[in-house]
Amino acid sequence: MRTLWIVAVCLIGVEGNLFQFGDMILQKTGKEAVHSYAIYGCYCGWGGQGRAQDATDRCCFAQDCCYGRVNDCNPKTATYTYSFENGDIVCGDNDLCLRAVCECDRAAAICLGENVNTYDKNYEYYSISHCTEESEQC
């Protein structure tokens, strides 16, 4: 079981700060990030390719696009400050790079929350080998 946890942490932790983004996801969806989004569709989790499979997967695609726009800020490892105020995620960094990464994660968490009803268990642990359609443009 511990090995599975470590593998899941490595997979979802590839983009953004795992614990920070996971906390945002939990607040907005009520779902644990590692169990629900670490390997989902073509974009949630490790990398991404092909066409997003549903609205939930499109949230992760949009986050990948957002990270692409702030790549100089090291979005995969950035540690930023944020808080929850009246149910809202508030990014608090004065550092523009860290704030930009936080805003990418914030937008993705909000999107996942707004689309939690589209979550399809058929896309859990979805093989990237199925993600062969041409990708949309960011």
Swiss-Prot record:
This protein's UniProt keywords: Blood coagulation cascade inhibiting toxin, Disulfide bond, Hemostasis impairing toxin, Neurotoxin, Phospholipase A2 inhibitor, Platelet aggregation inhibiting toxin, Presynaptic neurotoxin, Secreted, Signal, Toxin
Keyword Disulfide bond: yes
Identification of the protein by name: Acidic phospholipase A2 inhibitor chain HPD-1I
UniProt note on tissues of expression: Expressed by the venom gland.
Disulfide bonds: 42-131, 44-60, 59-111, 65-138, 66-104, 73-97, 91-102
Main location: secreted
Gene Ontology molecular function: calcium ion binding; calcium-dependent phospholipase A2 activity; phospholipase A2 inhibitor activity; phospholipid binding; toxin activity
Its job: Heterodimer: slightly affects neuromuscular transmission acting presynaptically. It has a low catalytic activity, a low anticoagulant activity and weakly inhibits ADP-induced platelet aggregation.
